[in-house]
Amino acid sequence: MPTRNMPLTKNPVESPDHEQELVLTVQYVADKTDIPNRRLFRKWVKAALSKPAEVVIRIVDRQEGEILNRDFRGKSSATNVLTFVYDDDVPLLGDIVLCAPVICNEAQQQGKDLTAHYAHLTIHGILHLQGYDHIRDEDAVVMESLETEIITRLGYPDPYVIQH
């Protein structure tokens, strides 16, 4: 897993956000075109958190996404979101890696609004950080229900309904 004290690449653009219940750092190491701003990431993270946390959200390009997915999951391609949990105590400590090109391609292919898709995957990562998973069917139902509840409360459409 990446270490919290070492950036994965040189010179990321960091946007630290300090508040008592959430310390959020957003690292933009991919092209920032069409990537939501720190204010939106903060809103989405806070909506999904159930306890204090220190979170780094890192937006990466396809190459870094492929390297991380290969090194930590044994997969040969980039994925949309990876979550690295460092501590399940309070505050939670973890990193969420979002692969910008994968997210953009998925949104286009699925007919989803790009911002809504970023919101969904950020919420998905935060739920993983809190111990939720979707390996077993019954766990997937719980996690997807929570994702849907949170994202619709924020005014976005249900991410599991196919958009036409």
From Swiss-Prot:
SUPFAM superfamilies: Metalloproteases ('zincins'), catalytic domain. Transmembrane segments: none annotated. Its cofactor is Zn(2+). GO terms for cellular component: cytoplasm. Disulfide bonds: none annotated. Binds 1 zinc ion. Zn(2+) binds at residues 124, 128, 134. Keywords: Cytoplasm, Endonuclease, Hydrolase, Metal-binding, Nuclease, Ribosome biogenesis, rRNA processing, Zinc. One of its GO terms (molecular function) is zinc ion binding. It is found in: Cytoplasm. GO terms for biological process: rRNA processing. Its EC number is 3.1.-.-. Gene3D superfamilies: Metalloproteases ('zincins'), catalytic domain. Its main location: cytoplasm. Single strand-specific metallo-endoribonuclease involved in late-stage 70S ribosome quality control and in maturation of the 3' terminus of the 16S rRNA. HAMAP family: Endoribonucl_YbeY. Belongs to the endoribonuclease YbeY family. NCBIfam families: rRNA maturation RNase YbeY. This is Endoribonuclease YbeY. It comes from Nitrosomonas europaea (strain ATCC 19718 / CIP 103999 / KCTC 2705 / NBRC 14298). The gene is ybeY.
